[in-house]
């Protein structure tokens, strides 16, 4: 749920010049990340938007989507310690990328 802490940890554990390849729910048209839900101190979940669940091969019920990222994710990655961030999109059935374009964030420490 704390994606900024996760980004800092990615940057911390990567070697200098290490590279992070990240996929995450992303809204092309959104300049800012949409926070859909928050984890409370008591472990409960506060829903700020109607719950959305994404596919999970382990749990048939899916995984709760806590946020859908906007373009500000690039700034958050830089703030976390990445010096270069780029975004690419792909659609390639032969590699299993179906449906809408898959977005990849590539961040170098």
Residue ranges and their predicted role:
Residues 2-109:
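S-adenosyl-L-methionine-dependent methyltransferase catalytic module, highlighting the catalytic core
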């Amino acid at each position: 749920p704390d994606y900024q802490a996760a980004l800092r940890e990615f940057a911390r554990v990567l070697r200098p010049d290490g590279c992070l390849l990240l996929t995450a729910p992303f809204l092309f048209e959104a300049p800012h990340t949409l926070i859909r839900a928050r984890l409370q101190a008591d472990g409960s979940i506060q829903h700020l938007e109607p719950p959305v669940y994404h596919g999970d091969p382990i749990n048939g019920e899916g995984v709760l989507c806590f946020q859908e990222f906007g373009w500000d994710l690039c700034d958050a990655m830089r703030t976390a310690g990445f010096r270069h961030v780029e975004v690419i999109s792909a659609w390639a059935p032969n590699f299993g990328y179906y449906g809408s374009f898959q977005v990849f964030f590539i961040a170098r420490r």
